Swiss-Prot record:
Cited Pfam families: SIR2 (PF02146)
Matches recorded under PANTHER family: NAD-DEPENDENT PROTEIN DEACYLASE SIRTUIN-5, MITOCHONDRIAL-RELATED, NAD-DEPENDENT PROTEIN DEACYLASE SIRTUIN-6
Name this polypeptide is given: NAD-dependent protein deacetylase sir-2.4
Gene encoding the protein: sir-2.4
Protein species of origin: Caenorhabditis elegans
Domain Deacetylase sirtuin-type, chain residue ranges per copy: 31-292
Chain residues that bind Zn(2+): 144, 147, 163, 169
Cofactor binding, note field: Binds 1 zinc ion per subunit.
Amino acid sequence: MTSVYESLLSDYPDKGVIGKPEIRDTETEIIEKLRTLYNHFVQAKQTGKPIFVLIGAGVSTGSKLPDFRGKQGVWTLQAEGKHAEGVDFQVARPGVSHKSILALHKAGYIKTIITQNVDGLDRKVGIPVEDLIEVHGNLFLEVCQSCFSEYVREEIVMSVGLCPTGRNCEGNKRTGRSCRGKLRDATLDWDTEISLNHLDRIRKAWKQTSHLLCIGTSLEIIPMGSLPLDAKSKGIKTTTINYQETAHEKIVETAIHADVKLILYSLCNALGVNVDLGDDLPDEVPIPLKIS
């Protein structure tokens, strides 16, 4: 489970603020805030400037994976000498939140999606890799250091920090050429620099967006935690969805304190976007809120 990821990371004392109290908006407050977010989505479609999305661990709690800084989060409980409970990464399945995000992407409301999660569920649910930035990596991914071919594994790659895994590339699928370059893991350690390619893709995404939506993240760790500040400097407003107060609560336009999947599924319902839930969900489907 998540303890495997914990065990792979090096010791690092500054994990941001942990264990903040949860805030629960009333249904009236949620509906009012949801209307504001709905209007941003409508405008995004009308103007052709899709919503820019940042995903945090709160999106995967519906998949039975713990978050990090919540009341039962990995770092919160670690500070108490305990371990967070959850399913093994290898059996975790995309939940309602992942499938709602995919539906909004398919419908053209959102395009670039940054995920801070290393569980691979955003890729697994079907978000196209060209629009997905796995900014902290993916525990199931190996990358060739020579031709940059990617290999998605069934098992966790048991290292972090972009280290060689001992395997070799099987060849560049795009060109058909043999390679045999060394493979490395694709997950950052605490002190690993974020890929320059990722940072360049983020810079380009700002030019194409009308609004920033931060989902299930406390925004404690930079540089991704500073995205609302970047948005403000560009005249772009931000909405956050998180039970706890985020690091930038006072500068965002709307801070929604409610269940992530309830907001996303209700938003899809209000926009008339069909969510393909399949028949293998790890969590219950919420009753969507009516905003009209």
